[in-house]
């Protein structure tokens, strides 16, 4: 049986410690692919980028961690991964691990 393909993203950015911890944990059970925002994108909800071009760059860190950093939102990352980057749809999509509380639904504008 083949290992599941796991797409990992977050809202804290590809350099956040939580995404690396999640990548390490998911490496035990599947083949994780990290595609996350290049910079912190907290509190953007389901936003997507409509007017600016999305840029994707390869990121390599110590310990074998590698992924793609996208100049957009977490939703952009998932969408571009599934529609343009991956050869096949992932078996699982995970977002996290968050640096702080997930309070998006508690914010009143």
For the regions a protein language model found, what residue spans apply to each?
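A cross-family phosphate/adenosyl-ligand binding-site feature
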Residues: 2-6, 20-85, 89
């Amino acid at each position: 049986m083949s290992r599941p393909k796991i797409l990992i993203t977050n809202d804290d950015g590809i350099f956040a410690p939580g995404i690396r911890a999640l990548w390490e944990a998911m490496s035990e059970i599947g083949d994780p692919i990290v595609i996350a925002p290049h910079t912190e994108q907290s509190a953007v909800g389901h936003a997507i980028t409509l007017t600016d071009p999305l840029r994707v760059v390869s990121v390599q860190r110590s310990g074998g961690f590698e992924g793609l950093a996208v100049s957009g939102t977490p939703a952009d990352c998932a969408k571009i991964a599934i529609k343009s980057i991956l050869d096949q749809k992932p078996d699982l999509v995970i977002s996290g691990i968050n640096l702080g509380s997930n309070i998006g639904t508690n914010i009143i504008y």
